Amino acid sequence: MKHFVDSLSIVKVNGFDNVTSIIDVGTGAGFPGIPLKIVFPEIKITLLDSLNKRIKFLNAVIDELGLENIETIHGRAEDFSKKEDYREQYDLCVSRAVANLATLSEYCLPYVKVGGCFIPYKSGEIDEELNNSKKAVQILGGKIEEVVKF
């Protein structure tokens, strides 16, 4: 239950009600992408993961739940972010438990449209990691607007 609640916690973020497309990088078992799709069926969701067995599992879950307008991609985040069909195509990029924040920013920010948002789900004490990521975020054209702790 905790994973579902955590997945939906981003709806409190300013501007979420304008989101029409989300990419979930390193989706794993589909968190937060699948719960977001269930609650917000109108949002286009892309689930990206490097392990094909996870993608096969997610496809089975999507079929079983009858979810529509949701895409799964087997591939590496750093490779797909260079492809024109995915680069700067999403209002929101989310990711949880994938990498440190500097690396994660390099993977995820290229997917976000100008004016969009990247929300990394992080746990524990993140102040040092946040500080270490500031340069990468700036180089990639992003800025840290808010840190929300749940």
Where do the language-model regions lie?
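Conserved SAM/SAH cofactor-binding pocket of Class I
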Residues: 5-97, 105
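Conserved beta-strand signature within the Rossmann-like core of class I S-adenosyl-L-methionine
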Residues: 115-125
